[in-house]
Amino acid sequence: FTHMLLQKAGVPTPDATVAFSKDSALEALKKHGFPKIIKPTVGSWGRMVSKLNDMDAAEGIIEGREAMYPIHHIHFLEEFVQRPPRDIRVIVIGDNVAAGIYRNSGDGNWKTNTHLGGSAETCEITNELEDICIKAKDAVFGDIVGIDLMESNEKGMVVHEINNTTEFRNVVRVTGVDIPGLMLEHVKGLA
């Protein structure tokens, strides 16, 4: 649903397909090719996010998901974006892009989650980054969100996730921006 709202609003995203069964997921992969990323529709910390390099890997991972709760029978298949070995996490509070960090992949891992060994460093908020993040927040009717973006080698900046219960510990640690304080001030202003 988030992906559709972003596309409707003209926010750049990786190409994606949603499948509601093992057979339709495998058919989509045959049609669109590899590599692909398969993600749960709800989750955090990169858990259950896998890179599918071929049909054998796809069949094994999708078969495992089919044995789980029905929510995991929704297969969100996303293009594998060729990019630098990092992504960007930006915290948006109301109409303020508060801070951002680069999350660098660790130990050759394609995932950028810092708890998997990645590192974080400050990301300058450019006008382009600010515009995309505000547009993305508005597209999903968000107020306080974490937006994850990738710098695609082909498409430029693309939004690959929006978190309405975002983690911000590393953003605070790296940038020194008081995200909890900004959130509190924003919420008090809404009262």
Language-model features: locations:
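Active-site nucleotide/adenylate-binding loops and adjacent lid/helix of ATP-dependent enzymes
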Residues: 1-76, 82-85, 127, 191
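Generic beta-strand structural signal
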Residues: 18, 92-93, 151
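Protein kinase-like catalytic core scaffold
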Residues: 36, 76, 99, 145, ...
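Short, glycine/acidic-enriched loop or turn micro-motifs at the edges of active sites
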Residues: 42, 82, 149-151, 164
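Short strand-connecting beta-turns/loops that link adjacent beta-strands
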Residues: 43, 95, 152-155
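Phosphate-binding site of ATP-dependent enzymes
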Residues: 47-139
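A short glycine-rich, hydrophobically flanked beta-strand micro-motif that places a catalytic Asp/Glu
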Residues: 78-79, 88, 142-154
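C-terminal active-site "lid" helix and adjoining low-complexity regulatory extension at the edge
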Residues: 138, 151-191
